[in-house]
A protein has these predicted regions:
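N-terminal capping/small domains of soluble enzymes
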Residues: 1-103, 323-370
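Active-site-adjacent beta->alpha loops and helix N-cap segments on the catalytic face
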Residues: 3-5, 56-59, 78-85, 104-106, ...
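Short beta-strand/loop segments at the ligand-binding rim of alpha/beta enzyme cores
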Residues: 15-23, 90-97, 155-166, 204-216
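Catalytic cores of alpha/beta
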Residues: 31-39, 104-116, 170-182, 207, ...
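C-terminal helical cap(s) of enzyme catalytic domains, especially alpha/beta-barrels
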Residues: 38, 56-68, 132, 200-206, ...
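Glycine-rich phosphate-binding active-site loops on the catalytic face of alpha/beta enzymes
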Residues: 45-55, 119-130, 186-197, 229-251
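Catalytic beta/alpha-barrel core
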Residues: 72-76, 98, 120-125, 137-146, ...
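Catalytic alpha/beta core domains of metabolic enzymes, predominantly
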Residues: 196-279
Length: 371
């Protein structure tokens, strides 16, 4: 697992995530047994959705009785979830439980009963009328004060919190992301529908939370598109067969081992997200850097100072012969530059190590932009 951490640098719930490929919940289908059959190709899995109080358990029975959907049915959600969690104890897959509840107290009571060994995912995604009428799923996206209250209630119990939601339902997804971040959420699990990478980039530029991109990400090109626009992981639900998962796992592992930064953003001038500031030069000409700094409220002088301070004492401090005297201002390795490459060769810095150092710089930048 140490090799996985060096490769991807992913920690969730204080556990190393082996690969940025995950399984998303599907009611009545994704349980511990489903996950264990695919465990060799994933780093995280969200089982569920599990209804956890009387209104949502009644809604689940209504949906199951309709015959069109599978649901997990039980009389005691705590007992059921303890059984599922116990099955996963020896697995290195980070476990999340996708939960349908109608009140903050329902979530916090469950967290106190189960403890902090799992990620608690609030289901703000389900759009089935019975669930929405019960006060969960997409209900929360139109009543964000209630969703924020659930996040806060869970965080008061000391657990890791994810929120699963569908893009384009809330009045403003960026405002929602900021509200969830401020409330204490740790993860945004986003069903992008047909919104594409531009919407993902907007959310990445709104908050520092770990982002899992979901929906039809079944090939490496699609996966890279999501990762290069702000996602930290991707998840699959209906198409989470072993072959698809294995293919994504192998491809991203190979890419990371070759490139050094598995989810490196596109450069800012090519549509990259805010992390791409690590590739930007001095703010001396009219380009996308200037409006980006203005939008995030970062004066040019502070931007210059921040980058220089961040690379002090690191190999990125070198580069007298580069355009601006330091590798801090140099572009992505995929962009040709003989001055950058001369510096890398002079100081024995591999292209892979260069990209890892740029990843470290981007993390510092994100922590400064989103304190």
């Amino acid at each position: 697992m140490r090799a996985a951490f060096e490769r991807f640098g992913l920690l969730i719930n204080d556990r190393i995530v082996r690969t940025p490929v995950g399984i998303a919940s599907m009611a009545g289908i994704v349980d511990a047994d489903y996950v264990l059959e695919r465990a060799g190709h994933i780093g995280i899995a969200f089982i569920g959705g599990y209804s956890i109080d009387r209104p949502t358990m009644t809604a689940a029975k209504t949906l199951a009785a309709g015959g069109d959907r599978k649901e997990f049915l039980y009389d005691d959600p705590v007992k059921e979830l303890k059984t599922q969690i116990a099955k996963m104890e020896t697995s290195d897959v980070v476990l999340g439980i996708n939960l349908r509840g109608s009140s903050p107290d329902s979530f916090s009571a469950l967290a106190r009963a189960l403890g902090n060994t799992v990620v608690y995912e609030i289901d703000a995604h389900c759009r089935q009328p019975a669930m929405v009428e019960a006060g969960c799923g997409e209900y929360y996206l139109n009543h964000t004060d209630r969703l924020v209250a659930v996040v806060r209630a869970l965080k008061e119990t000391g657990v890791t919190v994810s929120v699963k939601f569908r893009i384009g339902v809330a009045p403003d997804d960026r405002t929602l992301a900021v509200a969830l971040w401020k409330a204490g959420a740790d993860i945004l699990h986003i069903d992008l529908m047909d919104a594409g990478s531009a919407k993902l980039r907007q959310i990445r530029n709104s908050c520092p939370l770990l982002i899992i991109a979901n929906n039809s990400i079944t090939n490496f090109d699609r996966m890279r598109e999501m990762l290069s626009h702000g996602a930290d992981l991707v998840s699959i639900a209906r198409q989470s067969d072993e072959r698809t998962l294995a293919g994504l796992d192998a491809a991203i592992t190979r890419f990371a081992d070759e490139e050094g930064w598995y989810n490196s953003p596109k450069q800012l001038c090519r549509g990259g997200d805010i992390r791409a500031l690590c590739f930007c030069c001095m703010p001396v000409k009219e380009c996308p850097l200037i409006p980006t700094l203005e939008r995030i409220g970062l004066p040019r002088e502070d931007y210059i100072r921040m980058k220089l301070e961040s690379v002090r004492g690191t190999p990125l401090e070198h580069g007298n012969q580069t355009c601006f005297g330091s590798l801090a201002w140099c572009c992505k390795i995929s962009s040709p530059c003989m001055f950058r490459n001369m510096t890398l060769k002079q100081y024995g810095i591999s292209t892979k190590e260069y990209m890892r150092l740029k990843r470290d710089l981007s993390e510092t930048i994100m922590s400064r932009v989103f304190p």
